């Protein structure tokens, strides 16, 4: 089994959902983001999502857009992100890593080369925010050959017929975008999630991770119980950004994010 399958199977036996924190690679710099990445599993991360900085992150709100710009300013490239994953794998070979980004950098890198290099670095899955199912052929064969999961995104506005189409070739887990709009804005109610999840369960047996609009421990607990995982992104980035001075990391940066992550993990595991 893949690391993603192994982790979700283990959590199912434990009777709880997963916590998936997000960090933007090289935000505010390579060393700080790597330090944070390495510390996240001990703070309660079950899987980790790494954002690949991009100059036009259309699905992201101002918080993650600002993080992407800081990452780019610090020299982030797709190759640099893979270097970070390789460094992480020197000390952790169990925690699943998922890259989240946009199609343009992958296309520029070369889809086949990217999938091979990502797998060699220790990446387990990829989420390509702006890649519709109709264009998935660009990556599908290369990803399968490299044993990489392509994580599919579905939303409240996804029709039933579209849902089955999108999830037909899905692997790893399903990322449910629980709100319409950009990241870090609104949040879905428990009632909304309870209404949405059965429809997704009918279309796939894969675990369902709920993201967009999950920011508090209570929301993370609810999402991880109704679904199979809660993804927390903007809330962690906001905390990190609040510790920066002139865009640079301070001694408060990593501890502040880890403290918040520990609180989220405690709620998910309660």
Curated annotation (Swiss-Prot):
GO cellular component: cytosol
Entry EC no(s): 4.2.1.20
InterPro entries named in the record: Aldolase_TIM, RibuloseP-bd_barrel, Trp_synthase_suA
Record-level Gene Ontology MF annotations: tryptophan synthase activity
Enzymatic reactions: (1S,2R)-1-C-(indol-3-yl)glycerol 3-phosphate + L-serine = D-glyceraldehyde 3-phosphate + L-tryptophan + H2O
This protein's UniProt keywords: Amino-acid biosynthesis, Aromatic amino acid biosynthesis, Lyase, Tryptophan biosynthesis
Biological pathway: Amino-acid biosynthesis; L-tryptophan biosynthesis; L-tryptophan from chorismate: step 5/5
Top EC class of this enzyme: lyase
Active site residues per record: 49 (proton acceptor), 60 (proton acceptor)
Highest taxon listed in the record's lineage: Bacteria
Subunit structure: Tetramer of two alpha and two beta chains.
PANTHER family: TRYPTOPHAN SYNTHASE ALPHA CHAIN, CHLOROPLASTIC, TRYPTOPHAN SYNTHASE, ALPHA CHAIN
Family membership noted in the UniProt record: Belongs to the TrpA family.
Chain's role: The alpha subunit is responsible for the aldol cleavage of indoleglycerol phosphate to indole and glyceraldehyde 3-phosphate.
Protein name (database record): Tryptophan synthase alpha chain
Organism: Gluconobacter oxydans (strain 621H) (Gluconobacter suboxydans)
